[in-house]
From Swiss-Prot:
UniProt keyword list: Ribonucleoprotein, Ribosomal protein, RNA-binding, rRNA-binding
GO CC annotations, alphabetized: large ribosomal subunit
Subunit structure: Part of the ribosomal stalk of the 50S ribosomal subunit. The N-terminus interacts with L11 and the large rRNA to form the base of the stalk. The C-terminus forms an elongated spine to which L12 dimers bind in a sequential fashion forming a multimeric L10(L12)X complex.
Lineage: Bacteria, Pseudomonadati, Spirochaetota, Spirochaetia, Spirochaetales
NCBIfam families according to UniProt: PRK00099.1-1
GO biological process annotation, one example: translation
Family in the record: Belongs to the universal ribosomal protein uL10 family.
Function comment: Forms part of the ribosomal stalk, playing a central role in the interaction of the ribosome with GTP-bound translation factors.
Gene3D superfamilies cross-referenced by the UniProt entry: 3.30.70.1730, 6.10.250.2350
Entries under Pfam families matching the protein: Ribosomal_L10
KW Ribonucleoprotein (keyword) present: yes
Domain of life: Bacteria
GO molecular function, one term: structural constituent of ribosome
Protein name (Swiss-Prot/TrEMBL): Large ribosomal subunit protein uL10
């Protein structure tokens, strides 16, 4: 008995392979109960932050991940699944979909951040980390504080002498 590979499935396999190719930040979401407009809104917000969203077939996604030697927890690929990838700041993308979790039926299944598997709780904690801009701003204020304090002290000393 010969096995005939469906050309549509083969095409989906190739598209998914390209979709996650060289991406280290991949998230799996359950979109059950979301309307088309909600899913489109989520997609637009994610794409606005240099991410991408794709509805996938679990079996094909499993084959793609297996070919890429990525071990994923089976619970991530059960039920309706959306895969989200982040090119730059993955925590910004995670914040976007956690904003949707608060107001919709969207559920986070897990994901990979820099190649390491994160369960739902870790992804949620990761989403609360400051962005790159926020971190730079915080670092700059930490560097500025001692200098500002020195200037105020010297000014107060000069005022006392006068």
């Amino acid at each position: 008995m010969s096995t005939k590979i469906n050309s549509k499935k083969l095409e989906m396999f190739d598209l998914l392979k390209k979709f996650i190719d060289s991406k280290q930040n991949i998230f799996f979401l359950d979109y059950r109960g979301l309307s088309v407009s909600q899913l489109t809104d989520l997609r637009n917000k994610i794409e606005g932050e240099h991410g991408a969203l794709k509805v996938v077939k679990n079996n094909i996604m499993k084959m793609v991940l297996k070919e890429k030697n990525i071990d994923v927890v089976d619970s991530c690929l059960v039920g309706p699944t959306v895969v989200v990838t982040a090119l730059e700041e993955a925590n910004v993308i995670a914040k976007i979909f956690y904003d949707f979790v608060k107001t919709t039926t969207l559920k986070v299944k897990g994901g990979f951040v820099l190649g390491e598997f994160y369960d739902e709780a870790k992804v949620q904690a990761y989403s609360k980390l400051p962005t790159k801009k926020e971190s730079i701003s915080l670092f700059a204020s930490v560097l500025k504080a001692p200098v500002s304090k020195l200037v105020r002290t010297l000014k107060a000393l000069a005022d006392v002498k006068n």
